[in-house]
C-alpha cells in the first residue's frame, strides 16, 4: 500500500496537472544559461578583469580619503534592483568618481555611530536610568507564556528570554522614557509655537553634539518668545533631554539595547529614516525594532505597510556594515527605488572595507564566527527574494488567481493612511540628514 502511494505521488504529470519540480528545473536551467552568457560577455572586457576584488580580510585602504588606484575599471550602469535579483556574481571594485567617493565617505561617517555605544561610562549611566526589576519581571512573565504556548503546540518557543527583555525595554522606552517633539512648547508660557527657521548652535550646544538648531516662536502675540530646539546627536545629551524625533529615538534606544547586553545595529535608510536591529540568539537572526512605532520584527512595515519606495538600507554595528535592503524590500519592482548612488560592485567594496576596518584587530576565531554569521544572513536575505519570486510565479498559474498569503508573509499594522503616516514623520523633523537631504530624522 505504501509502495502504491509512493508511485502515485511520482507519476508523470498530465496535461492538466502542474509539476512544480519541472518548472523549477526549467527556471534554474534558464538562469544558468543567462548567467553563463553574461559572464562570457564580461570576460571579453579587459578592463573588468583588471579590477581589484578585495576580500573582507585582505589589505585595503582603511580611510575614505586615500587616493584613487592607478587602474580604473569601467563602471556598469547603476541598477534599481538588489544584486541578488540580477543572479550574477559581484566583483567588488573601489570608487572611481566623485559621487562614489562622496557616498563612501558618508557610509564611513555613519559607521561610527554604533561605536559610540561602547563607552562603559555611558552604558553605566543608561543602566542607572532603566527600571531593571520591572523589565526583568515583565520579560520573565512573557517568556513563561511563550514557553507554555510552545509546549501546548509542541513547538519551539518563538522568542527567548533576552528577546523578551528587549521587548520590555521597547515598551518602557516608548511609553515612559522618551518623548516625541513636533513643535516644542514655549518654555515661558507653555503656548504652542510656530516654526521660525533655524539658528546657528551656541558653543555650548555644539559642544554637546548639536550640529543644527531649529528656531520656534511662541504663537501668543503677547509673549512672542523664541524657543530653541537643538538637534543633539550625542547620546549622553539625549539621556538628559529625553526628547526628539526619529534620529534621536533610534540613537538613544539602540544604546539602551547595548546597555542591556544586546548586539545592536543602527540601520540607516537613504530615504532619511533610521531604526534599530537587535540580534536574537534564540532565532540566530537580526530582528527589526522601531522605537518610534513600538514595532518588533515587522521589516515590511515601511514598504508594504506605509507604501514607501526604498533604495538603500544599510545596517551598522561594531562588527561592520551590511546591506539589509532585501529584508525591508521584498519586491523591488513594487517597492524599490533606484539604487543609483554607486554601482553595486562599489557598494559591496565599501561594505567589505568597513567590515575589515572593524574586524581586523579581532581574534581569528571571532573573525571566523562573524564570517559564518555573514553567510547565514546572506542565505536569509536570499530566501526573502526566492520566496517573493516563488509567490509571483505561483500567482501566474490559472489555479492561483485568487489572492493568497505569500510564503514569506509577515504581518504589518493596518494603517488607515500609510502615505500620510510616512509624510507626517518626515515633517516632524525639518532638518537635513547626514547626506545633506531634507528629512524626518
From Swiss-Prot:
* Gene Ontology molecular functions: metal ion binding; peptide-N4-(N-acetyl-beta-glucosaminyl)asparagine amidase activity
What's a GO biological-process term for it?
Answer: glycoprotein catabolic process
Q: Which SMART domains match?
A: TGc (SM00460)
**Compositionally skewed regions (Low complexity) per UniProt:** 46-84
Alphabetical GO CC annotations of the entry are:
cytosol; nucleus
Region described as Disordered: 1-23, 38-91, 397-441
Where are the Methylhistidine modifications? Answer: 6-8
Ligand binding (Zn(2+)): 186, 189, 218, 223
Compositional bias (Basic residues): 1-11
A Pfam family annotated for this chain is Transglut_core
**Alphabetical UniProt keywords:** Metal-binding, Methylation, Zinc
The entry's family comment says: Belongs to the transglutaminase-like superfamily. PNGase family.
Q: Which PANTHER family match?
A: PEPTIDE N-GLYCANASE PNGASE -RELATED, PEPTIDE-N(4)-(N-ACETYL-BETA-GLUCOSAMINYL)ASPARAGINE AMIDASE
Q: Any idea what this protein is called?
A: Protein PNG1
Organism, per UniProt? Answer: Emericella nidulans (strain FGSC A4 / ATCC 38163 / CBS 112.46 / NRRL 194 / M139)
Amino acid at each position: 500500500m505504501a509502495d502504491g502511494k509512493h508511485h502515485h505521488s511520482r507519476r508523470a504529470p498530465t496535461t492538466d496537472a502542474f509539476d512544480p519540480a519541472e518548472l523549477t528545473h526549467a527556471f534554474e536551467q534558464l538562469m544558468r544559461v543567462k548567467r553563463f552568457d553574461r559572464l562570457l560577455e564580461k570576460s571579453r572586457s579587459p578592463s573588468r578583469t583588471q579590477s581589484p576584488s578585495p576580500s573582507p580580510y585582505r589589505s585595503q585602504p582603511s580611510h575614505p580619503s586615500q587616493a584613487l588606484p592607478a587602474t580604473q575599471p569601467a563602471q556598469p550602469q547603476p541598477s534599481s534592483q538588489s544584486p541578488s535579483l540580477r543572479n550574477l556574481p559581484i566583483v567588488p571594485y573601489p570608487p572611481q568618481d566623485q559621487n562614489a567617493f562622496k557616498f563612501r565617505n558618508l557610509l564611513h561617517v555613519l559607521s561610527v555611530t554604533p561605536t559610540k555605544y561602547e563607552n562603559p561610562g555611558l552604558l553605566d549611566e543608561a543602566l542607572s536610568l532603566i527600571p531593571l526589576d520591572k523589565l526583568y519581571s515583565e520579560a520573565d512573565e512573557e517568556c513563561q507564556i511563550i514557553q507554555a504556548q510552545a509546549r501546548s503546540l509542541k513547538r519551539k518557543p518563538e522568542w527567548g528570554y533576552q528577546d523578551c527583555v528587549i521587548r520590555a525595554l521597547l515598551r518602557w522606552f516608548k511609553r515612559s522614557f522618551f518623548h516625541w517633539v513636533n513643535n516644542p512648547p514655549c518654555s515661558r508660557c507653555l503656548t504652542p509655537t510656530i516654526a521660525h527657521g533655524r539658528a546657528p548652535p551656541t558653543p555650548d550646544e555644539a559642544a554637546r553634539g548639536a550640529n543644527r538648531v531649529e528656531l520656534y516662536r511662541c504663537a501668543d502675540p503677547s509673549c512672542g518668545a523664541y524657543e530653541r530646539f537643538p538637534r543633539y546627536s550625542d547620546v549622553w545629551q539625549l539621556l538628559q533631554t529625553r526628547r526628539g524625533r526619529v534620529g534621536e529615538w533610534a540613537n538613544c534606544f539602540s544604546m539602551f539595547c547595548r546597555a542591556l547586553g544586546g548586539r545592536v545595529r543602527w540601520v540607516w535608510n537613504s530615504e532619511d529614516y533610521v531604526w534599530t536591529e537587535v540580534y536574537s540568539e534564540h532565532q540566530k537572526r537580526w530582528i527589526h525594532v522601531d522605537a518610534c512605532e513600538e514595532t518588533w520584527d515587522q521589516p515590511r512595515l515601511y514598504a508594504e505597510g506605509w507604501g514607501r519606495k526604498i533604495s538603500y538600507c544599510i545596517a551598522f554595528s561594531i562588527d561592520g556594515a551590511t546591506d539589509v535592503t532585501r529584508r525591508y524590500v521584498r519586491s523591488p519592482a513594487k517597492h524599490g527605488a533606484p539604487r543609483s548612488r554607486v554601482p553595486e560592485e562599489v557598494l559591496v567594496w565599501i561594505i567589505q572595507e568597513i567590515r575589515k576596518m572593524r574586524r581586523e584587530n579581532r581574534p581569528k576565531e571571532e573573525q571566523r564566527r562573524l564570517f559564518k554569521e555573514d553567510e547565514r544572513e546572506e542565505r536569509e536575505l536570499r530566501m526573502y527574494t526566492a520566496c517573493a519570486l516563488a509567490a509571483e510565479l505561483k500567482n501566474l498559474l490559472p489555479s492561483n488567481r485568487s489572492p493568497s498569503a505569500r510564503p514569506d508573509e509577515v504581518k504589518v499594522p493596518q494603517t488607515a493612511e500609510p502615505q500620510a503616516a510616512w509624510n507626517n514623520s518626515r515633517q516632524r523633523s525639518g532638518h537635513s540628514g547626514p547626506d545633506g537631504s531634507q528629512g524626518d530624522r
